[in-house]
């Protein structure tokens, strides 16, 4: 039976890892064993932070909506409650976009919500 050498496969695997480790500091960029550890850790961070990014953006949208609502005399919580009462079904991403880039439309929304809240209380 012929001997099978696996040098080609090993070389390709090493090359793939070292390509992913491009730009790393020290031996992590050119020493396979260290590069492999760093690349695996980088992939773990990437996986974790893809999930954290969703949390971070939601927090950012809430901060922006709260700031814009407070300019008009409402808190974030009362504003969101008012939106539910009025029946406006806009998500936080769109509301934050309106608060930053379409201030006049957001102000009209605040007026509608304020009148509904005053009517209900």
Swiss-Prot record:
- Assigned keywords, A-Z: Ribonucleoprotein, Ribosomal protein, RNA-binding, rRNA-binding
Q: Which Gene Ontology CC terms are recorded?
A: ribonucleoprotein complex; ribosome
Entry annotated with the keyword Ribosomal protein: yes
The UniProt entry, under Pfam families, shows: Ribosomal_L20
Biological processes annotated in GO: ribosomal large subunit assembly; translation
Q: Which SUPFAM superfamilies match?
A: Ribosomal protein L20
Q: Does the keyword tRNA processing apply?
A: no
Q: Please give the function described in this protein's UniProt entry.
A: Binds directly to 23S ribosomal RNA and is necessary for the in vitro assembly process of the 50S ribosomal subunit. It is not involved in the protein synthesizing functions of that subunit.
What is this protein's name? Large ribosomal subunit protein bL20
- Organism of origin is Wolbachia pipientis subsp. Culex pipiens (strain wPip)
Q: Which gene encodes it?
A: rplT
